Design a protein with these regions (language model features):
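Acidic/histidine-enriched segments that form metal/cofactor-coordinating
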Residues: 64-178, 294, 324-328, 337-368
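Second-shell loop/turn segments in exported
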Residues: 42-43, 59, 90-94, 114, ...
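His/Glu-rich zincin catalytic helix
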Residues: 1-68, 179-286
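Short, flexible turn/loop "capping" segments at secondary-structure junctions
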Residues: 82-85, 158-159, 180-186, 239-242, ...
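Flexible, glycine/charged-enriched surface loops at secondary-structure junctions
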Residues: 216-223, 286, 294-300, 336-346
Length: 368
């Protein structure tokens, strides 16, 4: 049973105990992502440079009071990583032993950055290389544009990594402003699942946060009222490639849905997409046999900014025909419901729950 605890400092904690697991999963979520460029800090408007959230993620993992957190966790036999999305930055660890100690290291390390010119320049180099590699990727621009056009109404958002010029211009004051503004208990969530002692966990969290001196900053994100409709009907990107790629995006407004209903929708969408667009689906086989697509249809479903965003995409040399088929498929509800396949998916889902092989993060995400 998922339990929510909110501390006096505003920190939200979600606990999903499961003593049948040997592993404990810990995720620190900061509500600061690639889109958070327009904010009010102590009543004054500020523009945060694009790419700051991602840059800060790297810095916090590599330069803090403990040193390089991923190296330290690796020496302790603990899996660890971090990533930045449109609306969040996340740091997670998976451990079997010394849960409380590892939790303390994660929380203390992330909140004790070492920020100076040398550190920033050391972080900057690899991120510039990461950005250049992303620009060389065949479909980076088209994937990015399709995603943004479907969900975001924000003028200053460029990409999670930012432009090369943004990365090159990041200074100490930019990092310090972002860290002090967003890395605070009332803007963070801690998710813990698996095997752990609840009382010990809560005590560690309280002790760590009590020892941190947070800046007295009042921050207000500039709220964007997203339209229920897509922002742009079509985005065309010209790149020097031999093979075209089409990405068709849909969004479902789930802002006012209850957490449990979001979880159920996520589960049903997984079945729906796999059954209708998977490798063995009738539609995929038909498009491959007719040489309309190269390879197979790819699909995804993500929860972003209160919307479930569905993407159906494929490499194709007959883009207009592929687009017409997919749009007609949705518009005229030509969906296939295979009861036998649905029951098989349901049985597999139940087996995952019984054997505890389900993805704890995917289970919890719609609930928080």
């Amino acid at each position: 049973m998922l339990e929510k605890i909110e501390l006096d400092n505003g920190l939200k904690i979600y606990l999903l105990p499961d003593n049948n697991k040997h592993t404990t999963y810990i995720n620190l979520i900061v509500n600061f992502g690639g889109k958070d460029n327009e904010v009010k800090i102590n009543g004054k408007n500020h523009t945060i440079k694009s790419g700051i959230a991602h840059f800060l993620e790297h810095l916090l993992l590599e330069s803090n009071a403990y040193g390089d957190l991923m190296r330290i966790f690796g020496m302790r036999g603990v899996g660890s990583n971090g990533f930045t999305s449109i609306d969040r930055t996340q740091f997670y660890i998976d451990c079997v032993e010394e849960v409380e100690n590892n939790l303390g290291i994660l929380l203390s390390g992330i909140h004790s950055p070492i920020i100076n010119k040398d550190v920033i320049n050391n972080i900057r180099g690899p991120i510039l290389e990461e950005k250049r590699r992303s620009l060389d990727s065949k479909y980076t621009s088209s994937i990015y544009n399709a995603s943004i056009s479907a969900i975001l109404d924000t003028k200053n958002f460029k990409s999670i990594l930012g432009d090369l010029s943004d990365i090159e211009s990041i200074k100490e004051k930019d990092i310090e402003l972002a860290f002090n503004s967003f890395y605070r208990p009332d803007n963070e969530i801690i998710v813990i699942g698996g095997r752990f002692n609840k009382d010990n966990i809560i005590n560690v969290i309280k002790e760590v946060y009590n020892d941190i001196e947070f800046k007295n900053i009042k921050i207000e994100k500039v709220k964007v009222l997203h339209k229920k409709e897509v922002n742009k009907k079509k985005v065309k990107v010209i790149e020097d490639i031999n093979l075209e790629k089409s990405i068709i995006s849909f969004k479902i407004d789930t802002l006012n849905m209850l957490p449990y209903d979001k979880l159920m929708l996520d589960t049903y969408l997984y079945y729906f997409l796999k059954n209708n667009f998977g490798v063995t689906s009738t539609l995929n086989t038909n498009l491959v046999n007719r040489n309309i697509i190269i390879g197979n249809i790819n699909y995804s479903c993500d929860l972003v900014e209160g919307y479930h965003v569905i993407r159906v995409e494929a490499n194709t040399k007959k883009m207009n025909l592929f687009n017409d088929i997919i749009i007609d498929y949705f518009k005229n509800k030509k969906f296939i419901f295979d009861e036998e396949y649905f029951n098989l998916c349901k049985r597999n889902y139940i087996i995952d729950l019984i054997t505890r092989s389900d993805d704890i993060y995917r289970t919890i995400d719609p609930l928080i």
